[in-house]
Amino acid sequence: MAKFEEKKQLRCSFCGKSQDEVRRLVAGPGVYICDECIELCSEIISEDFEEEEYNEFDDRLPTPKEIKEFLDQYVVGQDHAKKILSVAVYNHYKRIYYHNTKKDDVELQKSNILMLGPTGSGKTYLAQTLAKMLNVPFAIADATTLTEAGYVGEDVENILLRLIQNADYDIERAERGIIYIDEIDKIARKSDNPSITRDVSGEGVQQALLKILEGTIASVPPQGGRKHPHQEFIQIDTTNILFICGGAFEGIEKIIEKRIGEKTLGFNAKIESKKEKKIGDILRQIMPQDLLKFGMIPEFIGRVPIIVTLDALDKEALIKILTEPKNALVKQYQKLFAMDGVELEFEKDALEAIADKAIERNTGARGLRAIMEEIMLDVMFEIPSNDKIEKVIITKAAVLKEDKPIVIINENKKAQKRPKLKQRLQERRGNVS
């Protein structure tokens, strides 16, 4: 009896759980660790390895080829865009290094980037991946929320505040960051004709962005919002901040076609797939005058000299996005299911049906997760309550909602340990560290 009591008192030295509360307790010299804490330690170490992978180039500037190779691991297709971005980013950070280490009469000017491409073609994701690779602060802004100073809406300086916050208020680090301004096409000038009503969310915003795009010492309100005369400001130099502006620029292909003299597609012609395939080739022939005609002001166009065009994603590209990148959606869901001890499989025609749905909705890669969530909802609801589920197969019928996913039951399957509450995990993370 005494031995039984002594055995029962064995506890994990990290989380304090007794031997009866865990599946396995591993003994060391004077200490014990349970299987749950081992699993948590493994997660923390793997997270550190991921950070090291991103920080691989901290001590040196990667070459354009290395940048593209890194992008290839996460972004499917868009080779032309990735090549231009790789060279542009390399030259930008080379310019910063050159400026900081050598004094010369030749001043290298900053070259910001303008990305054009259909919705869901990967504009935002490309910018995010670049920032992760280079380990620099990154912020996303929505151009549609911006207005001229003095009007209801956000001042352009609030974009800089987000970057400062993401750099943990390290101004020197923020000054080498990347800002992605989305929906930039939505601030195009509304009309070529002068108007008595001021265009505060269109041309006015373009004018307001000019200084920070070119490089200036900006005064940023630390709490955001509008500037007040008696408040203190954060001073930040935007000279070395790389601005990437992105937008769908719907309709600009017609302006390009008109300029190059090509015939536009017939009014009633139902050949959208051909048009989608062609749009990337048309966009590659873009010239500054096309942007001017679209409604961007000359001064703004001059401050984003590097133009990157992205292709519309076809069915094959969407299937690759689902399965091939390091963080592909299929891999993410398979990992989620594996945490519950369940194997997840997608049939080939199911993946094709998911891609077809994304094309039908005209959402590109951005809409893939929403489609996946719709398909997986019922299964993900049931799995945690049924320890006998061993495998789930997603079929084309399940994607089209004609049938449910195939669920394979194993009566002999051992019960899966359920994850603990977030608070408990955080406490244990603190103990481990």
UniProtKB/Swiss-Prot annotation:
Record carries keyword Transmembrane helix: no
Biological processes, Gene Ontology terms: cell division; proteolysis involved in protein catabolic process
Disulfide bonds: none
PROSITE patterns, per database record: CLPX_ZB (PS51902)
Family the UniProt entry places it in: Belongs to the ClpX chaperone family.
Function: ATP-dependent specificity component of the Clp protease. It directs the protease to specific substrates. Can perform chaperone functions in the absence of ClpP.
Descriptive protein name: ATP-dependent Clp protease ATP-binding subunit ClpX
The organism's taxonomic lineage, starting at the top: Bacteria, Bacillati, Bacillota, Bacillota incertae sedis, Caldicellulosiruptorales
